[in-house]
A protein has these predicted regions:
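Hydrophobic helical membrane-anchoring modules
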Residues: 2-24, 163-166, 188-260
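Cell-envelope/extracellular polymer assembly enzymes that use nucleotide-activated donors
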Residues: 27-29, 55, 198
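Donor nucleotide-sugar binding loop of glycosyltransferases
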Residues: 37-40, 63, 86, 113
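Short, high-confidence coil segments that cap the C-terminus of an alpha-helix
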Residues: 53, 99-100, 128-132, 208
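Short beta-strand-to-loop acidic/aromatic patch adjacent to the donor-nucleotide binding site
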Residues: 100-111
Length: 260
């Protein structure tokens, strides 16, 4: 049982943007979007470092396999989000988090390892980053964790971001963390899987520090909802690439209205 999530709540001090966060006072909320993750959610929750995490919010979208019940028994706070969309679930979790200093986003399929969460927190805690991204392409991956078409699509999107935004990243993975004040200042609004890219782009354009951290990656438990097939990857990649270009030109028009 992980009752320690609520018992280890620390002081609610919120230092100004750009300063270091005290390890002893920081409040960390973990948001986990789920849809039929009964096979994996228990392992995800069990592996979260209880001495680091203040609260866990499982945002469930119409699961029919008992996912919310499993998560609730393990101490997670359950948020029901009947509306579809990965981004919508993440936004719901961000909005409902209880006065956090840092918000972590983690999938419920056990492809990322929750025990590696401190790696994402470290650059934020020592004042080097405002948003940290877990890169699955900088560390050795388990065989079959990412098919070639997903690797190609992620590298293509990351390459376009490097060119247009001058942000040196290698991956668009879902395991990430950010200062709560920064994430809320970005006014994120994407309700699809494009939400993860929106965070990166808006963060960079607003002048916040976006830093990558290597994380391991493993075959998910259960079937992918988005990009497990070549067809799904192509559709996701096209949407993400168009989003990257659209935000770039929108920003240029906003800065130079006479040249729009």
């Amino acid at each position: 049982m992980l009752g320690g999530w609520t018992l280890c709540c620390r002081g609610a001090g919120h230092p100004p943007h750009g300063g270091e966060l005290s390890q002893d006072q920081v409040r960390v909320s973990v948001v986990i979007p789920t849809h039929n993750e009964a096979q994996s959610i228990g392992r995800v929750l069990a592996d979260l470092p209880a001495d680091t995490v203040t609260e866990v919010l499982v945002v469930d979208s119409n699961s029919t396999d008992g996912t919310p019940g499993i998560a609730s028994k393990m101490g997670a706070r359950i948020l029901r989000e009947p509306r579809r969309g990965y981004g919508r679930a993440c936004l719901t979790g961000l909005a409902e988090a209880s006065s956090p200093d840092i918000v972590v986003f983690l999938d419920g399929d056990y492809s990322d390892r929750p025990a590696e969460l401190p790696f994402l927190l470290a650059p934020i805690l020592d004042g080097r980053a405002d948003i940290t991204l877990g890169s699955r392409l900088q560390e050795p991956r388990s065989a079959g964790a990412l098919p070639w078409h997903q690797i190609f699509g992620n590298r293509l999107a990351a390459g376009l971001i490097r060119i247009l935004y001058r942000l040196d990243i290698s991956d668009l993975g879902p395991f990430r963390a950010g200062r709560a004040d920064v994430l809320r200042a970005l006014a994120l609004e994407e309700t699809t899987y494009g939400w993860a890219v929106e965070m990166i782009l808006k963060g960079k354009l607003a002048g916040f520090r976006v830093v990558e951290v290597p994380v391991s990656y493993h075959p998910r438990i259960g079937k992918s909802k988005i990009s497990g097939t070549l067809r799904g990857t192509v559709g996701a990649a096209w949407f993400i690439l168009s989003l990257i270009v659209r935000y770039y030109f929108r920003h240029r028009r906003a800065r130079n209205p006479r040249t729009a």
